């Protein structure tokens, strides 16, 4: 689909906003189940259960804390900061799966272009980053990071083609569309809202069909502030509006 705006300011593989391996993460001890957290509910948030076909609540295998990023470190683009512990103490979740199981797009009602609901911000063989906007940035809207997965070769090839062509277009996906598979007994996922890493265990936002299984309540976190945007490239071109390219079914 045509990219509407935004700019990473860096090649996607060099940006800690898209390539989660640059930030990294550490294991943490936490409750491995759905939780209730007070505060506003995210209307029409991506539903992680839909990453499985048919949708389900998987067993949670482990919890992690993603590292913050310090943009002021020298040389640019900065350096890894401390592990994120606020506003949420869990920011990456390992979920059980079956080796060879197909993985789908976490569903959302609001389309971004035609019938598409998500756009690929970054892809490599074992990592995928999706945004639920048409911005070439995670600063607005929802972003989902998948780690330790197998991205479909067709999707990866299309992403590399459009990335090399200047990112005026990027691959997009529909609800129910397969983008890859799990080749091991688990994979990891993180979810962000306007750049902030959220708690992926929260049932009122990411697992709404399973709220009856939420029996553990956590304290409401401090106010969540939008991310500090990554520095824009000084000569970043304005996104053009060419004929959209549709992602082939993997």
Give the positions of each predicted feature.
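Ser/Thr-rich, Proline-interspersed low-complexity disordered segments
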Residues: 220-249
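Contiguous, well-folded functional domains in the mature portion of proteins
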Residues: 1-218
